[in-house]
């Protein structure tokens, strides 16, 4: 408790201690990042977050792009009390920053998705237990992020992580994992490489251990901009890196890190299904006709569930005029109440900065929608242009070159017509305030990056990024734009898409078919 009151929190030792406990010193105040393992929370935990926002912050909390929760205005001397309150509901801020193994992320619909191959949550928990306080990997060359997908669709963006894992079955039906290494965004964006097409599940932790040992031994420590594992994999080549991992496996295979059926079952028991009722699917024809707003919301903000009679619901945190991913303390309390009444007391956060109620009875969906409208959670824009991923940017972050939130708001206001928004269809728009890419701009169908030009804020636009299966990095459109021009620029890009698209084509599909030139010509023709 005395440490926050002491000076020198920027000293090497104290800085490492501070960061590995999730505490940043930002532009105007400290920021505390709270760990939310694989995005799962219960109602009591959410109420505690609401209390912290109310008592120690300015009444807000923020969902990050790694499914964590951030408080942007705590006083430094209050941090020990905040951590103590978090501990009462089994929460902490350990390893949410620093050069260590960070929070393992996954699909926000894990365990309920209709297209799921294997529930990834037990594997996320196994990895979490292995990584937390791991003494060998507490001071890596640079931060390290792992994502695990469990479904046919990749909703965990595994191809742009330091390690990405996805379950597969061999010809005999045995479970294993495809293992990807060397992905990442930031200053040097890279789509990772698969180095193992079938890793037996028993060897999962041993293989991760081997990867980390190779990285810890050969990763650069002389230049933090060249220290991520993606730089090492590229320098060695994926093939040579894989050989070094296999050399480590000679010492690890069959050892103490080998997983057993008993251990996997022990962890899996914490992820049993709730007490689902035997329900039939609901025919919404009459309700949709009577309530067009409900029909519109249902088409965008719900997803098929593995159990008949249930549905997963996404609560949009992207209404016009609200910073993407922000919730007030009152909204947090309301979400906790909704989770208890509609979803067995649990909810999830997503890397798209929204909230999910994963187990809603279809017969209660209309009643839930009415409550979500009252709480400001029913904007029917999930997967659409205004469902913007956005970092806090220059309004908060000391690293940012430019503000992000005002850009998001200007675009939301320009595209506030729901009819037009639905006509445009699915599109990912991501905004980062600097090259660290916390807003994942590299993998947005449209990406926006804040840059500094002689002390003025400008914005660079990229097109063609994609975080899903077969990930791709966006291509820079051309010279950057002033803040006041950004909504016009996006409008011109959308106009090209609408003119050029064929039936059922998404923005990314049209871009991949016609290339960047038509977009570039339209945007810059009016500026020169």
What kind of region is each of these model predictions?
Residues 24-33, 187-192, 307-317:
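Gly-rich Lys/Arg/Thr-decorated short loops/hinges at beta-loop-alpha junctions or inter-strand turns
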């Amino acid at each position: 408790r005395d440490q926050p009151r002491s000076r020198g929190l920027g000293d090497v030792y104290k800085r490492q201690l501070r960061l590995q406990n999730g505490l940043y010193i930002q532009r105007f105040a400290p920021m505390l990042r709270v760990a939310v393992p694989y995005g799962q929370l219960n109602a009591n935990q959410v109420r505690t977050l609401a209390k912290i926002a109310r008592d120690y912050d300015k009444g807000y909390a923020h969902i990050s792009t790694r499914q964590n929760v951030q408080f942007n205005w705590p006083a430094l001397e209050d941090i020990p009390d905040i951590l103590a309150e978090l501990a009462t509901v089994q929460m902490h801020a350990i390893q949410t920053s620093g050069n260590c193994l960070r929070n393992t992320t996954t699909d926000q619909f894990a365990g309920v998705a209709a297209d799921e191959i294997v529930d990834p949550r037990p594997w996320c928990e196994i990895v979490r237990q292995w990584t937390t306080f791991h003494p060998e990997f507490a001071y890596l060359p640079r931060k390290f992020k792992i994502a695990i997908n469990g479904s046919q669709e990749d909703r965990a963006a595994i191809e742009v992580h330091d390690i990405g894992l996805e379950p597969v079955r061999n010809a005999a039906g045995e479970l294993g994992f495809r293992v990807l290494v060397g992905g990442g965004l930031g200053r040097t964006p890279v789509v990772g490489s698969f180095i193992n097409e079938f890793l037996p599940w028993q060897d999962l932790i041993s293989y991760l251990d081997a990867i980390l040992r190779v990285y810890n031994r050969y990763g650069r420590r002389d230049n933090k901009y060249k220290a991520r594992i993606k730089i090492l994999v590229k320098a060695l080549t994926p093939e040579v890196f894989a050989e070094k991992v296999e050399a480590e496996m000679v010492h690890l295979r069959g050892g103490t890190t080998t997983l057993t059926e008993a251990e996997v079952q022990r962890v899996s028991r914490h992820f049993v299904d709730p007490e689902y009722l035997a329900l039939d699917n609901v025919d919404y024809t009459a309700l949709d006709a009577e309530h067009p707003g409900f029909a519109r919301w249902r088409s965008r903000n719900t997803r098929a569930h593995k159990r008949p009679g249930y549905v997963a619901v996404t609560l949009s945190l992207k209404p016009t005029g609200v910073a993407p991913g922000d919730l007030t303390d009152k909204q947090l309390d309301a979400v906790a109440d909704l989770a208890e009444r509609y979803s067995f007391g649990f909810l999830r956060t997503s890397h798209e900065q929204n909230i999910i109620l994963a187990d809603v009875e279809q017969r209660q969906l209309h009643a839930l929608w009415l409550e979500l409208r009252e709480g400001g959670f029913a904007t029917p824009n999930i997967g659409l242009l205004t469902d913007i991923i956005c970092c806090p940017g220059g309004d908060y972050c000391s690293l940012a070159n430019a503000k992000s939130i005002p850009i998001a708001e200007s675009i939301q206001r320009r595209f506030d017509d729901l009819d037009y928004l639905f006509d445009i269809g699915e599109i990912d728009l991501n905004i980062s305030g600097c090259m660290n890419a916390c807003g994942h701009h590299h993998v947005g169908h449209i990406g926006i990056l804040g840059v500094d030009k002689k002390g003025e804020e400008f914005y660079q636009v990229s097109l063609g990024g994609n975080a899903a299966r077969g990930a791709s990095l966006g291509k820079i459109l051309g010279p950057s734009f002033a803040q006041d021009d950004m909504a016009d620029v996006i409008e011109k890009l959308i106009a090209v898409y609408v003119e050029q698209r064929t039936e059922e084509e998404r923005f990314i599909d049209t871009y991949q078919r016609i290339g960047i030139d038509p977009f570039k010509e339209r945007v810059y023709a009016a500026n020169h």
